[in-house]
Amino acid sequence: MGYVDWCIEQHRKTNHYYDKYLPYGFHLRMANNVYEDFQHLLDEELNDYCGKAVWGHDLIEDTRVSYNDVKNQLDEGAADIIYAVTNDKGKNRKERAGDKYYEGIRNTPGAVFVKLCDRIANVQYGKMSKSRMFEMYKKENSDFEQYLGRYTSNKDLEPMFVYLKNLFNE
């Protein structure tokens, strides 16, 4: 079984759905489509890690696999990215994605890219389905950009930040 199938299978085994009724592979494919659109922004090594991490970005958070499981199935670089984008424990969204969480993303090569792939896919789907999540993402986008270091450490990903912001303005 290849890594893409393995990632999808882990979500299937835990009955994990996207928007309550879609197989989770739907979201992973959307995130991968974003990766394919922007992979030219990455160097070759990071491109390989991010390509794998996009498929596995929710594994540790949403399925019954550990960092070591991910490392053994994908590789250490992808596992480090997936670990970085995994929400912290918390009682609400703000606690799960606090300063420490975003610091870990900023400090892990490739993690900002993968987080942007995930967020863009979620916003695209939210816009298409008229989900209430779309408005939440729109409201928090300015802070999200700051947390990810748009104007400081991640200027090379500017086309992704612009694309995301434009989704809210179309």
What are the roles of these predicted feature ranges?
Residues 1-170:
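Active-site helical microenvironments for divalent-metal-assisted chemistry
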